[in-house]
Regions:
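Active-site signature of alpha/beta-hydrolase-fold catalytic machinery across serine-
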Residues: 9, 34-38
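Short alpha-helix in the alpha/beta-hydrolase fold that links the catalytic acid
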Residues: 78-88, 100
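A conserved short beta-strand
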Residues: 41-51
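Short beta-strand/loop motif that positions the catalytic acidic residue
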Residues: 62, 68-70
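C-terminal catalytic histidine-bearing segment of alpha/beta-hydrolase fold enzymes
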Residues: 89, 94-139
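Gly/Ser-rich "nucleophile elbow"/oxyanion-hole loop immediately N-terminal to the catalytic nucleophile
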Residues: 1-23, 137-138
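Gly/Ala-rich beta-loop-alpha elbow adjacent to hydrolase catalytic centers
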Residues: 24-28, 32
Length: 139
């Protein structure tokens, strides 16, 4: 698919160091989780307010760390986190979900607004700090 082509092309760039990751938001977050079901050479998958596949056979194929970023006020997506966490744990697959207080769906974009509530900005800042820390540690 498109991400596989992009991944292969990016690996050939002069500045590439062999590390790659995938990140998506909302629908793209769900696609990031889906991509992780077949990816083998990624340093990680970073899912922002996206849902996981519900097929345990697909989840069982995940071989890369999946890092979830969720807003506490996003009931639709958050209703899926525990089932995902339980399935990934039972399958012994790497999944870490963090839920940020004061944030809803789309909090990374909404938290960038200078007029955003302080709690929303704090959630965005904490998620961004976590993302950059995880990327720096990626191998």
């Amino acid at each position: 698919g498109d991400l596989e082509c992009l991944e292969g092309g990016a690996a050939k760039l002069a500045g590439a160091d062999g590390r790659g990751a995938v990140m998506g938001f909302c629908w793209g977050g769900a696609q990031t989780f889906r991509f992780a079901t077949d990816a083998k050479d990624l340093a990680g998958a970073f899912v922002f307010y996206g849902t996981a596949p519900t097929d345990n056979a697909a989840l069982a194929r995940i071989a890369v760390p999946v890092h979830g970023f969720y807003g506490a006020d996003d009931q639709r997506v958050n209703a899926t986190i525990e089932a995902t966490r339980s399935a990934m744990l039972a399958l012994e697959r790497p999944y870490e979900a963090v839920v940020y207080d004061g944030a809803g769906h789309g909090f990374m974009r909404a938290g960038d607004d200078p007029a955003a509530a302080p709690e929303l900005r704090a959630a965005r800042d904490a998620a961004f700090a976590r993302l950059t820390s995880l990327l720096a540690k990626a191998k």
